[in-house]
Amino acid sequence: MNKFEDIRGVAFDLDGTLVDSAPGLAAAVDMALYALELPVAGEERVITWIGNGADVLMERALTWARQERATLRKTMGKPPVDDDIPAEEQVRILRKLFDRYYGEVAEEGTFLFPHVADTLGALQAKGLPLGLVTNKPTPFVAPLLEALDIAKYFSVVIGGDDVQNKKPHPDPLLLVAERMGIAPQQMLFVGDSRNDIQAAKAAGCPSVGLTYGYNYGEAIDLSQPDVIYQSINDLLPALGLPHSENQESKND
């Protein structure tokens, strides 16, 4: 029995699932930290902070940077720095700086993962409505989808500012299913992190976990999605479609 035979729509996470956004996110985080005269983190570290929205990203960045600064000063025999600005206010300032810098680098620092466009096109051609659910701040979402030429595939897009409760809360997924006019159990959700899988389970949606994204350094199988794939086009055969690589070879 095909686990996905009752699927009537598919929704996707964005960062780490459809796009590699780490270069742009890391650049904006580091520019914001540098502007506040704090240590910069680097892409490898920032990747472990991605997934819960920009506010949480800023909190994680600031916590790390303040600790790193204290460690560096102690190593150099310098006294600790007394922060005149409370941490909450620093997070607010950091977020404002991040938004400015990310607006400048988002498009050039974001790339489609392999087979994404072909997979979305094949699903749309089959007549399945497609949705997008991301914790990314809403103002950045539409311009990014347009720049990557994938906005045309989605009938429903939910950004991080469009709901009160972000993933892993089920609300964004339930909203997408409602707008698609289908039951949650008829909507497949595809993501790369535990937030995605937890949201899908809470909403009652079947889930696909992808192995290549951003998941806080842990394996996606620990979140127990219904199915695990190494490439996004691996979900096509499960939905009754030819694998996109096979389709490409037929077209050559």
From Swiss-Prot:
The active site is at residue 13. Mg(2+) binds at residues 13, 15, 192. It catalyses: 2-phosphoglycolate + H2O = glycolate + phosphate. GO terms for biological process: carbohydrate metabolic process; DNA repair; glycolate biosynthetic process. It is an enzyme of class 3 (hydrolase). Its EC number is 3.1.3.18. Pathway: Organic acid metabolism; glycolate biosynthesis; glycolate from 2-phosphoglycolate: step 1/1. The keyword Metal-binding applies. Its cofactor is Mg(2+); chloride. InterPro entries: HAD-like_hydrolase_sf, HAD-like_sf, HAD-SF_hydro_IA, HAD_sf, PGP-like_dom2, PGPase_prok. SUPFAM superfamilies: HAD-like. The keyword Metal-binding applies. GO terms for cellular component: cytosol. Keywords: Carbohydrate metabolism, Chloride, Hydrolase, Magnesium, Metal-binding. GO terms for molecular function: metal ion binding; phosphoglycolate phosphatase activity. Belongs to the HAD-like hydrolase superfamily. CbbY/CbbZ/Gph/YieH family. Monomer. Specifically catalyzes the dephosphorylation of 2-phosphoglycolate. Is involved in the dissimilation of the intracellular 2-phosphoglycolate formed during the DNA repair of 3'-phosphoglycolate ends, a major class of DNA lesions induced by oxidative stress. This is Phosphoglycolate phosphatase. It comes from Shigella flexneri.
